[in-house]
Amino acid sequence: MSCDLHIHSTCSDGAVPIERLASIAARTGLHAIALSDHDTLLSAQYAYAHTGQDGVELIPAVELTGYDFERQHRVHLLCYYPDIDCPALREHCAIMKERRNACALQSAKELEQLYPQFTTDLAWETTKASGCLLYTSPS
């Protein structure tokens, strides 16, 4: 049985919408994939709701970002079959989403300064379906 236990979708920094991952995995011969997006429970919720799709087992997972203060660097922890109702886990994901939003908004504003054809509103329209960013237009 072949599987990939670390796959990202557009719920975090992946390029493929979560709904299409199983069919791609099936075409490549995988029997199971773990939907392990960064600091969001969206992919785990999807996997719990769609345990098997296109003949591929969907394993609920989340990749949690943490910090190793002793070694002074960021770490990523893969968590399989997370309790999506756990208050501490939900709070961690909410905090990380706020940080990601602030960083994305700052990056978008910097891009607007460099490239007049780029607008934060256009970037928001392109990415809002992912559910990963919470941008409110100033207009």
Enumerate the predicted regions with their spans:
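Conserved, mostly hydrophobic/aromatic
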Residues: 111
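Active-site phosphate-binding/coordination module
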Residues: 48, 62-101
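Conserved small/polar residues in nucleotide/adenosyl-binding loops
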Residues: 135-139
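Short amphipathic alpha-helical segments, especially helix-boundary/capping motifs
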Residues: 20-24, 82-87, 114-117
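Short, surface-exposed acidic
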Residues: 116-128
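An N-terminally biased module of ancient metal coordination in phosphate/nucleic-acid-related enzymes
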Residues: 1-72
